[in-house]
Structure formats: structure tokens, C-alpha cells
């Protein structure tokens, strides 16, 4: 009635996330599309509008300095390995050129961040190959194909 529309934001690639977890999120998104369009004729403007009103994009989990995710041991270890970040004995990041390079690499959260060698920064338990395929499918608007990975 009021024309207010809630928008869910989806994030993939969290530490510990498995491919089945990602598929569960995709299934929920597709269910939302189904519910939003169930009484509408496919191919109509109304159907398209209702379908597009459901956010089908996903951001990549990004470890921003100072966040709880950034302070977790697996994330610190990955960033140390892939960006050369150093941490104090208390787990605080050392502000040096490696940190600067990492921060400068933080761009659009919809994109996969890569290290200086082009390797993806993947905090999840999803293989790099599958994560990159999933990210590509999302970018192409083919989110449902993730269910077949």
C-alpha cells in the first residue's frame, strides 16, 4: 500500500561457508522470486518488475580492517599468506605497505579481490574454481545455475 519495498542483501564467501550453504541461499532467493511472481503472467511487465524487485546479486565477504571478520585467525592467516599482512602478538594488523596494498585492492564488494599474483581472496570453504564460477553466474544473471555446481 505504501509502496515500501524491503531489500535483502546477500553475501557469499564467508569463512566456513560451503557450496551447499551457498546453494541454500540461492534456493531462498529463487523462492522469493517465485513467491513475488506466482500470481503474475510470465513475460509481462508486472512479472518482470516483481522478479527484478528481488535482489539476485551477491556481494563477496570482505574482511575490512577493524571488523570482527578481519580479526579472525583464518582470515588473518589468509591475508598474511596472500598479501603479506603482519599482525602483532595481540592480533592487531601492522600498518605497513602490505596493509596499504590490501586496502587499495578493496573495491566493489560484488567483485572477487585478488592478490598480487592474481589468486582470489577466498575466505570460504568453497574451492576457488567453484567460487569464481558462482561469481560469474551471478554477474551474468544466471544465479539458478549455481544449484547445478
Regions found by a protein language model. Give the residues of each.
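A structural motif corresponding to the C-terminal lobe/cap of the Radical SAM core domain
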Residues: 1-148
Amino acid at each position: 500500500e505504501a509502496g515500501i519495498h524491503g531489500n535483502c542483501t546477500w553475501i557469499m564467501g564467508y569463512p566456513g561457508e560451503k557450496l551447499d550453504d551457498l546453494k541454500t541461499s540461492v534456493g531462498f532467493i529463487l523462492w522469493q522470486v517465485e513467491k513475488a511472481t506466482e500470481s503474475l503472467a510470465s513475460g509481462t511487465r508486472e512479472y518482470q518488475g516483481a522478479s527484478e524487485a528481488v535482489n539476485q546479486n551477491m556481494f563477496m565477504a570482505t574482511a575490512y580492517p577493524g571488523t570482527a571478520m578481519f580479526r579472525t585467525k583464518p582470515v588473518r592467516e589468509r591475508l598474511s599468506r596472500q598479501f603479506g599482512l603482519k599482525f602483532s602478538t595481540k592480533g592487531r594488523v601492522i600498518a605497513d605497505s602490505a596493509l596499504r596494498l590490501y586496502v587499495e585492492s578493496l573495491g566493489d564488494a560484488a567483485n572477487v579481490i585478488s592478490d598480487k599474483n592474481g589468486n582470489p581472496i577466498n575466505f570460504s570453504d568453497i574451492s576457488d574454481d567453484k567460487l569464481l564460477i558462482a561469481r560469474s553466474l551471478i554477474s551474468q544473471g544466471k544465479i539458478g545455475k549455481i544449484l547445478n555446481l
